Swiss-Prot record:
GO terms for cellular component: cytosol. Binds 1 Mg(2+) ion per subunit. This is Phosphoglucosamine mutase. The modification Phosphoserine is found at S102. GO terms for molecular function: magnesium ion binding; phosphoglucosamine mutase activity; phosphomannomutase activity. InterPro entries: A-D-PHexomutase_a/b/a-I, A-D-PHexomutase_a/b/a-I/II/III, A-D-PHexomutase_a/b/a-II, A-D-PHexomutase_a/b/a-III, A-D-PHexomutase_C, A-D-PHexomutase_C_sf, A-D-PHexomutase_CS, Alpha-D-phosphohexomutase_SF. It is an enzyme of class 5 (isomerase). One of its GO terms (biological process) is carbohydrate metabolic process. Belongs to the phosphohexose mutase family. It comes from Mycobacterium marinum (strain ATCC BAA-535 / M).
Length: 445
């Protein structure tokens, strides 16, 4: 058996790679790990999911695994991933389980596990759980020692009270289009923005289990651009299937990506004295324009590998207060233990109201260098990335770019893809060099 955990939990096509049997085994193994690492007593796990069709099957299997090992399951239903992380701490649960494949297509699903306080697991803990999956079920409690299932009726309201802390001023007079991706934010997202005072126009907020992320949300911005322009809205915010991401569109329909959002929020926090150590944490995928904008403002930038778990690790290690990814995962540890798209949207709108500036004006503090990202599907990520022909193509591109740009070659942690990213002084060069390297990867993969 290969490694189960990727960069963001366990993922696969539901009922093919991610089966009910595997979900049950993961639930049981997580419960066993908890029993071996803590003292005696009744244990509780928060369990949530996004609305994709396979979620109910996997939820039932995970809960069966947990309860078979004596852990009570606190079922919160369809809620965003950051809600499950928050509620794990708010309910003083021993751990949390989120069933979601985030921005992936509907047939996929995933299982993400949070430790105490809603923090993501480290590699050693994931390895321990994997070893317990391989070993099979442990001792089975009987009678009153079997875990129970409890429905947390107040879960959504508790989460909404939490995210309201992100909004330090009323948003009255602001019109926002919210794209919920037919996902986990479909109910709580519009409620959160309306509670803050904004006029909300919601789109793609009618999940039926089959339409999550289907040409909508943060990976398909055409609909929200059109809606912002049609309604004359001040901005649009787009979430993904589990609402841990937020991308924005300004009143002109132009994209404000995670890099630009981080610049806006970093400057706001610096001004308020809330940017710890005057430092922003981001990944190697962030545009060079972010680094230049932060240098001009006197903000340090700490760079990590790709994946919000690495951003989170650096935030915790340095006790920093803001980090994120270009993809829209924005983390503010003072407001949550993981990326929260709704919190990000509220903070962005708060800055607009506080300054009286448009989103376009705020985002203009960062000048984006042309960046081209090509996803290349391969059968063997490691072999393709290491192929001599690919390395030669990368070397040629780096020689041409010199100090005026950069190239990154990165295997996806969740999909059979290698991502080729090139930044250059002009778009033609970025496209040409990215295509050249992508062709080499495709031929090798």
């Amino acid at each position: 058996m290969g490694r189960l955990f990727g960069t963001d939990g366990v993922r696969g096509v539901a009922n093919r790679e991610l089966t009910a049997e595997l979900a049950l085994a993961l639930g049981a193994a997580t419960a066993q790990h908890l029993a071996s690492s803590t003292g005696p007593g009744r244990r509780v796990a928060v369990v949530g999911r996004d609305p994709r069709a396979s979620g109910e099957m996997l939820e039932a299997a995970v809960i069966a695994g947990l309860t078979s090992q004596g852990v009570d399951a606190l079922r919160v239903g369809v809620l965003p991933t950051p809600a499950v992380a928050y509620l794990t701490g708010a309910y003083d649960a021993d751990f949390g389980v989120m069933i979601s494949a985030s921005h992936n297509p509907m047939p996929d699903n995933g299982i993400k596990i949070f430790g105490p306080g809603g923090h993501k697991l480290d590699d050693a803990t994931e390895d321990r759980i994997e070893s317990l999956v391989a070993a099979g079920p442990g001792l089975r409690p009987v009678g009153s020692e079997i875990g129970r299932v409890i429905d947390a009726e107040d879960a959504a309201d508790r989460y909404l009270r939490h995210v309201s802390k992100a909004c330090t001023t009323r948003l009255d007079g602001l019109t926002v289009v919210v794209d919920c991706a037919h996902g986990a934010a479909s109910e709580v997202g519009p409620r959160a923005y309306r509670a803050a005072g904004a006029r909300v126009i919601e789109i793609n907020a009618d999940p039926n289990g089959l339409n999550i992320n289907d040409d909508c949300g943060s990976t398909h911005l055409e609909a929200i651009r059109a809606a912002v322009l049609a309604h004359g809205a001040d901005l649009g915010v787009a979430h993904d299937g589990d609402a841990d991401r937020c991308l924005a569109v300004d009143a002109n329909g132009d994209l404000v990506d995670g890099d630009a959002i981080m610049v806006v929020l970093a400057l706001a926090m610096q001004e308020a004295g809330e940017l710890a150590s005057d430092t922003l944490v981001t990944t190697v995928m962030s545009n060079l324009g972010l680094h230049l904008a932060m240098r001009e403002a006197g903000v340090n930038v700490r760079t990590t590998g790709v994946g919000d778990r690495y951003v989170l690790e650096e935030l915790r290690a340095g006790d920093y207060s803001l980090g994120g990814e270009q993809s829209g995962h924005i983390v503010m540890p003072g407001l949550g233990s993981t990326g929260d798209g709704i919190v990000t949207g509220l903070r962005l709108m708060t800055r607009m109201v506080a300054t009286g500036a448009s989103l376009a004006a705020l985002a203009s503090r960062m000048q984006t260098l042309p960046q081209v990202l090509i996803n290349v599907q391969v059968t063997d990520k490691a072999a393709a990335a290491a192929a001599p022909s690919v390395q030669a193509a990368v070397d040629r591109a780096e020689t041409e770019l010199g100090d005026t740009g950069r190239i990154l070659l990165r295997p996806s942690g969740t999909e059979p893809l290698i991502r080729v990213m090139v930044e250059a002084a002009d778009e033609e060069a970025a496209h040409r060099l990215a295509t050249s390297v992508a062709d080499a990867v495709s031929a090798a993969g």
